[in-house]
């Protein structure tokens, strides 16, 4: 199964350009860490991006919560992505009909498709949401993740919802290259979906607001996910951002090496 191959092997065989670029980057930097920078000021976001940049493969943003957003922020994020060799993932979670998301993705204040290598979407509206996003993103070489599972307590993303999300992805592999999920989604030998898992923590089990945490070992080795998404565990203490980023990078990479060796 592709999940158990090295990132380099998966990059060499992957038909999706965005997934190929991500796997090559992960192998090159020896990291499967994504930082979830859920902060509300331009200064904080840029500081986290620069401090964590050497240790991550992906910077995950919520650009619409930045109080002082401007076009210079996007320009600086793109420069930092080049400087430190990481991809930008706008965690937009699109959830409307195709014609609406097409404009939300390509136009408006944020013009997400112009700078974010990756974005994501709920599948609740049906397959039209993928069609609308693809129209904008595919010509730019962007990639889409579908939300198949979430890490919050009581989430409704399970059962038939998850199953149908996987089927939608299979029908749209030119643009959809993976999932936000809690375990591997590859069931066939000829498919290789990237799975990014939120809710990863080394020190805590929850946050009191429904978030549930698992360790990098649980996520990568036991559940077969590919990228660990970490937020407050890294930047919660401003004085330890680089230390924690390096710590999670090493934990995630060591878990990956163990998974590959086991198979």
From Swiss-Prot:
Alphabetically sorted, this entry's keywords are: Decarboxylase, Lyase, Pyrimidine biosynthesis
Biological process, per Gene Ontology = 'de novo' pyrimidine nucleobase biosynthetic process; 'de novo' UMP biosynthetic process
Question: What SUPFAM superfamilies has UniProt attached to this entry?
Answer: Ribulose-phoshate binding barrel
Check the record and name the Gene3D superfamilies matching this protein.
Answer: Aldolase class I (3.20.20.70)
Catalyses: orotidine 5'-phosphate + H(+) = UMP + CO2
Q: Which family does it belong to?
A: Belongs to the OMP decarboxylase family.
The record's section on NCBIfam families has: pyrF
> What's the protein here called?
Orotidine 5'-phosphate decarboxylase
- Organism for this UniProt entry: Rhizomucor pusillus
């Amino acid at each position: 199964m592709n999940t158990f191959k090295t990132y380099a092997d998966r990059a060499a065989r992957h038909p999706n350009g965005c997934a190929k670029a991500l796997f090559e980057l992960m192998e090159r930097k020896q990291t499967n860490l994504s930082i979830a920078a859920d902060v509300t000021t331009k200064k904080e976001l840029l500081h986290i991006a620069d401090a964590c940049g050497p240790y991550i493969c992906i910077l995950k943003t919520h650009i619409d919560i930045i109080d002082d957003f401007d076009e210079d922020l996007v320009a600086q994020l793109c420069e930092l992505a080049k400087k430190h060799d990481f991809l930008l993932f706008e965690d937009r979670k699109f959830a409307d009909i195709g014609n609406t998301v097409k404009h939300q993705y390509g136009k408006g204040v944020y013009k997400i498709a112009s700078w974010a290598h990756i974005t994501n979407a709920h599948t609740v509206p049906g397959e039209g949401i993928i069609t609308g996003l693809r129209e904008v993103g595919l010509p730019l070489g962007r990639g889409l993740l579908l939300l198949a599972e979430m890490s919050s307590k009581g989430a409704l993303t399970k059962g038939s919802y998850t199953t149908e999300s996987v089927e939608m992805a299979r029908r749209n592999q030119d643009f959809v290259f993976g999932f936000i999920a809690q375990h591997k989604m590859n069931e066939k030998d000829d498919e290789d979906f990237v799975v990014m898992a939120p809710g990863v923590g080394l020190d805590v089990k929850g946050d009191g607001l429904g978030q549930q945490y698992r360790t990098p070992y649980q996520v990568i080795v036991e559940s077969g996910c590919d990228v660990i998404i970490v937020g407050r565990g890294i930047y919660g203490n401003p004085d330890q951002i680089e230390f924690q980023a390096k710590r999670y990078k090493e934990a995630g990479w060591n878990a990956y090496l163990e998974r590959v060796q086991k198979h």
